[in-house]
Every structure is written in C-alpha cells, then in structure tokens.
C-alpha cells in the first residue's frame, strides 16, 4: 500500500511545485528575457491552461490504457518542459515551456487521484486526501524559500533544473515503484456496470460544484492576499510573508488533524463544518472592525478548506471504480476553469478584492450546505484494494 501512497503524493506535488518554485526568480527572468514582470505573470495562467488541456484527455487515456501509461509520459514531459524553460531566450518560448509544464503536471495530477480511488476505500481515501492536502499546503511556503536559497548562488535557470530533477524523481517512481492499479475491464455481459458510472450522476455533480467553489475560495484568497494584506490592511512585505506562512501552518495543522476527526465524526459532519467555517469567515470579514478580527476571518478560510476539501474529493470519486480517471479529470477541469472564471469575471465587473473574497465565501457556503443536506450519496461502489493482485 505504501508504494501507491508515495507515488500518488509525488505525482500530485509536481503541480504546486511548478506554480511556486519559479516566482522568486521572476524579476531576473523578466530582465533576462527583456519582458516586464507583468507580462510574465501570465505564466501562471498559461500553466493552469496546460493543466486543464491535459485533463481533457488524460483521464480517458488512464481509464483505457492504465495509470502508468499516463504518469510516465506526464513526468517525462514535465522534465523536458522544465529544461526548455531554463533554455528559453524569449518570453514567448518561456511561456510555451510553461504550457508544456502544465500539460505534464496535469497528467500526473489526474493519475494520482485515480490511483487513490483504485486502492483505497471511502474512509481511508478521505483520510489520505486530507493528509495530501496538508502536504500540498507546505509547498507554497517551502518552494519560494528553496528558490531563494538556490538563487543566492545560482542563476534563475537553476530553478527549472531543480524542477526537472523533481520530475526525474517522479518518473523513476512511476517506472520502477508504481504498479498498475487500473481495474480489469468488465466482461461484455457486465457492461451495464461501466455504463452506470455516469458523470451526470446527481451526487457526483453536487461534489463537483462543492469542490469547485471551495477551490475558488482558496484561489481567490491567494490571488487577492497581496491587495488585502499590504494595500488595504497596510502590512509590510515581510509581515505579509509571515502571515501567509502562518495561514499555511493553520492549513497543515487542520489537514493533518482531519484523518483523526474522521475516526470520530461522519464525513458529512466535517463537510458541513467546512462550509460553516466559510460562512463565518465571510461574515467576519464583512463586519470586521479591526485588522486582528480580519486575520481571524482569514484563518477560518484556511481551516474551512482543509477540513472539508479532501472529504469532498473522496466522495466525488467514490461512485467510480471503472472511470476514476475521467472523474478525476472532470473534477480538475471544473476546479481550474471554474475558479479562474470567477476571478476573471469579478475583475472585469470591477468587484474589489475584499468584496470578491466575501462574495465567494458566502456563495460557496450557502450553495454547498444546500447540496450537502439535500443530495445524498448513492449505493457505494466496491472495487478497490483487491486490484493489487492482478497489477
């Protein structure tokens, strides 16, 4: 079992590492490529676009051909793209490399969740996904620090060589440690089971909405945090970094505590708790009379996301034993595109950073609470863990 957990964690971590590792070198990258920092900030969106593009096909291929045939090319593409970015001499080539990096990371991301669906039952999967969420929260804190240390002695290209080394590690795990987990194709007489795993399942769609809104909340917070904390609340850059590190600490603590909570409370209870925390955060930020109260509201956001997201993702994947790859892709596409669309629309309409965050918090909590209470899970699908024996 440990081999599947290690490989899944490694496959997922390429995604946040690709986002956060290079940010510290952005000023030097812009100077060397004769581009403005503003022009290169689009590299974040280009990376997410690459991930979304990968998810359009990676899930289907993973369900038809297996998890390894997607993970191995995905890791290889991430390596090649990282090297390509390090060798880029124009901003156009750099952005092309970032898109390819996103493609590779997207393939690995989809496979990781499919593997967890293949090998774990519902309760254990919820616990593991909560732990994975906590580990993912470490990356935005550690990656810039590691990038800063690297750049003390080496040029910005070394950041992408470091990502390439990470990709090589994932490739080696995928080649030599990971075993195939895709369930055997059903017999012709059992095709009804595969056909019953519809993406239009009400329960699955409800969890797609809940997880997409939750990701929209956390990405809205990350996207608006410089404006909220430095421009509106007046904190210095160093204080901003400290606050963001503390919020990551809250996320990690809650994420690592959630598996223990799942041994006491039902998953539904934790999901309701998550949305109540979002609602409390929205109300707190809306009526806050002081910076201290506002910071408390921000910690509620991090706690709310960490306590509920892994559980919701596990529930979303639950109905799919034969189409876990497609289900994982659908979740990823919805989360990336839905959150990006909200942030873009809010900016176009002219909604301020503060109201943008409050609005998505309250909308997410109300819609999600209604879905949790009125859309019940269907009959659970078995088909996990015994898969190992024919891997």
Swiss-Prot record:
MF annotations from Gene Ontology: transmembrane transporter activity
Annotated compartments: Cell inner membrane
Family label: Belongs to the major facilitator superfamily. DHA1 family. MdtL (TC 2.A.1.2.22) subfamily.
CDD domains: MFS_MdfA_MDR_like
Superkingdom of origin organism: Bacteria
Ranges in the topological domain labelled Periplasmic: 25-41, 90-92, 152-157, 222-244, 290-292, 352-355
Organism listed in the record: Shigella dysenteriae serotype 1 (strain Sd197)
Positions on the Cytoplasmic side per record topology: 1-3, 63-68, 114-130, 179-198, 266-268, 314-330, 377-391
Protein name: Multidrug resistance protein MdtL
